[in-house]
């Protein structure tokens, strides 16, 4: 059986030759060079991903939502009852939540995965990959053992790879877990080196008078657990959560297949920071869907070197932003594959890099 280290070593590099060919192809399309802006850059990025074989395209689409509870909820860092995690996960199986509606609009399947919900029995309709009934309270103990973190990473990587074998070429990640912006902020603070007060936000409408406590909880968690910012697994195990581990696993699994993965919001940025510490080779496969309204979002994205495509003032999580951005990926593929070429037309644009065809 493959180990986590074995799988991390399988992540292929982006193909620069394929990207150069894509650049030449796009420059020859029926438009001024560069006039489709970031859509062009996105198409070129996709062309470099080995899993797409040099031609940007979208097959099946999947949003994987990692659901888990967090022991740190006990510290008063969230206003919603912990039971909401399980209730909302059940709602996802009925297709009535935000991510389900947006994914259906995008033609994507939603996979609701229990990686650590705190219920006595598994919830019917969920994919059961639970490793524990919620993580430890990071304010007083590690979130989990390194062994559990590595086990869940490996399980999710393998599951993601199976979906790829069955035709999924575009992945999105999502999260569900009460109080999970607290461990996410702890991860962002640890890896970026920024102070907790710079990255801790209100999450799911935490009253501002409770924000100081949340900041203190994050600071205590980091001081107590001493996560190594250079070791992504260590950070996830000490101050993360099972949903964050699961999202990192999707990113690593998709990248190991040479396929793109759409990030969602703040939770996914934190998971991406940890995943990139495990394997910097995954970064070109990460596509930032939107700018989360959560405090600390820009800090995390800046550290990742990513610029989101949308700014919708969203902070729902669930994978809602990833689902919303899927048509942008399809649009980039469409211009690459379906636009006409200048060489086959009567239009000549010598040295024209800025004007549009009507100027």
Curated annotation (Swiss-Prot):
Keywords: Cobalamin biosynthesis, Glycosyltransferase, Transferase. It is an enzyme of class 2 (transferase). SUPFAM superfamilies: Nicotinate mononucleotide:5,6-dimethylbenzimidazole phosphoribosyltransferase (CobT). The active site is at residue 318. GO terms for molecular function: nicotinate-nucleotide-dimethylbenzimidazole phosphoribosyltransferase activity. NCBIfam families: cobT_DBIPRT, PRK00105.1. Homodimer. Catalyzes the synthesis of alpha-ribazole-5'-phosphate from nicotinate mononucleotide (NAMN) and 5,6-dimethylbenzimidazole (DMB). This is Nicotinate-nucleotide--dimethylbenzimidazole phosphoribosyltransferase. It comes from Shigella sonnei (strain Ss046). The lineage of its organism: Bacteria, Pseudomonadati, Pseudomonadota, Gammaproteobacteria, Enterobacterales. The gene is cobT.
